[in-house]
Amino acid sequence: LLGEVASCSDRIACRERPGEGLRFSLLRNGEPTGISFRAVPTGHEFSSLLLAVLNADGQGKNFPDRSVCDRVRALNGPIRLTTYVSLTCTNCPDVVQALNAMATLNPGVEHETVDGAIHQAEVAALNVQGVPSVFADGELLHVGRGDFGELLAKLEARYGIDAAGIEAVERRFDVVVLGGGPAGV
């Protein structure tokens, strides 16, 4: 699968090295991106692999607005995230893609996606009951559907932030609706 993905562009390469089990990591210019898979990301997770490659190259389109990206960059690390997925899960890609984007934005965040069907003994040892299940440094952080903001809030609560890394956002409004009538609903 990785060879086929690499054959799509002369800017992508696939190198093999000896190791235990099925695992691959994404590198950019030879440097780790913080994104790895212990899975064959087919099915719903194929888009997660492609977006991770695009995000690592700066071409991704699934990043949130600048203020949210600044919050991700301000997370105190190191943070080691592991997400257990099923390749048939329709909620898993949203969580995987959000956490991969966070790993791209903050070098202190590492995210590994694990196919629970391949690593059943690990799933049983951790008592994973549903997918996606996100573990932060070995402790359960989140289970089930989740969006970028929800996952970021949980990471901020657990690891804290460096407030100096966040710029204050001033919002100006042209119109303010006051009252509880039909226009205020």
Regions found by a protein language model. Give the residues of each.
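Non-catalytic, surface beta->alpha helical segment in thiol-disulfide oxidoreductase systems
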Residues: 27-60, 135-165
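Thiol-based oxidoreductase modules, predominantly thioredoxin-like and allied folds used
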Residues: 9-19, 107-121
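Catalytic cores of nucleotide-enabled group-transfer and carboxylate-activating enzymes in metabolic
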Residues: 78, 108, 112, 117-118, ...
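Local sequence-structure signature of Cys/Sec-based thiol-disulfide redox active-site neighborhoods
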Residues: 1-3, 72-113
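Extracytoplasmic thiol/disulfide redox context detector
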Residues: 1, 6-14, 45-80, 110, ...
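Structural micro-motif
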Residues: 17-35, 120-137
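Beta1/beta-strand and adjacent pyrophosphate-binding region of the FAD-binding site
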Residues: 166-183
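Short glycine/serine/threonine-rich phosphate/pyrophosphate-binding segments
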Residues: 93-94, 182-185
